[in-house]
Amino acid sequence: FEARRQRQMCIRDRAFAAKTLKEKISPVFAGSKEISIKNQGLTAVEKIFNKNAVGTSGATLHAGSYVRVEVNIVGSQDTTGLMTSQELEMMAATTISPIVDGAYQSGCHTASVWDSKSQRNIPRLMKFMSDFGLITARDPENKYHPMTDVIHKVLNDITIDDWAIIIGGDSHTRMSKGVAFGADSGTVALALATGEASMPIPESVKVTFKGKMKNYMDFRDVVHATQYQMLKKFNGENVFQGRIIEVHIGTLLADQAFTFTDWTAEMKAKASICISQDKTLIESLNIAKGRIQIMIDKGMDNKSQVLQGLIDRANKRIDQIISGEKPPLTPDENAKYHAEFVVDLDIIDEPMIADPDVNNEDVSKRYTHDTIREISFYQGEKHIDLGFIGSCMVHKGDIKIVARMLKNLENQYGKVQFKAPLVITAPTYNTVSYTHLTLPTSFEV
């Protein structure tokens, strides 16, 4: 980490000096690998990386190129945040890079085990990160109620640009806008201090849909069916692994799109990008504005007014879309993908269950989502120990569906009888607070 830190800081400082003095500089280190293919279009992630690239030759870059990019949103997780703060101190960094639009320090992982160690360490972490310029889940002076919301759910709410790059200290850092990557504490520290990150441009797998989702199905079933049909088509090979899933469901709003992108972490994908239509992206940005405003109303904005700045940027992005100045992100028609895959919605006619094969001879496959089954497989004989609705993929529409199901059972039988405990909880306060309801509905492609 130390060698990487020194190299990154040296490159950044020289680049800043050259930009300020408007002078060209000769390279000190060997140039990064650049792959540029003539007459080949760009995938969505290639477009984002080219737009945010720093210090390149100026050529159009394709997958496999190693690129230094500017980062828009950064998230620090509370269990690794102390290491991030130590690494920032090692850099002698005292304030967040002006390149970063917004950054958030979570408190979600330690909230569930608020033991004596957490009670000693987390307030100290929140104070450091607040002073550094981050929006913090817990206020160092206890001016607002602790925000124990799931980190990547919050990052999804504060991402306000479909061309953004997001770095987060959590494996589920997958957004419905832009492209997001989970990262270690050192990479998060570098992103906070320099506003940059370095990584190769990943290959992409294009996922499109045909047919119509049946009105009694849930979008989560489409998510599981995507994996089921993909594994079937590619003879059990997970073509998503280590790659970008570029998903084309242009009418999905932020919450449902996040259900898909968040799930891609379980399929070992590097990241995921949602391609949205104009109207859908505008509505998703308005949802983000509403949720950021809730955070402002709670008193979470800082002296730099980071949260208000995000709302201002969202308004600017909406104006760009409406005027046609900068349409929503789309890949080029002649972009090259590692694989292309079409999900058939017409054949999804019953709920799909992810059932990890914990007895698989291959240890690496015991706790993955490689085993997807239709609910009829269990013939009503599967024993349920616990029901839990409240993962990071859950949104308000899901909770409303559960409420309707329980009301229907009560109307039919006079009461609701549970054969196992059922836990229902919202992954974020914003899920409950925000008035916009995103009910899952059938969609046709």
Model regions and ranges:
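Flexible inter-domain linker/hinge segments
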Residues: A15-A44, I311, R317-Q320
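N-terminal amphipathic, basic-rich helices that act as targeting or association modules
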Residues: V28-P98, A254-F258
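Long, structured ligand/cofactor-binding scaffold of large enzymes
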Residues: G64-S198
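Short internal beta-strands
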Residues: D101-T110, I275-S276, A420-T428
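Mobile "lid/hinge" segments at catalytic clefts and subdomain interfaces of large enzymes
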Residues: S171-E283, R291-Q293
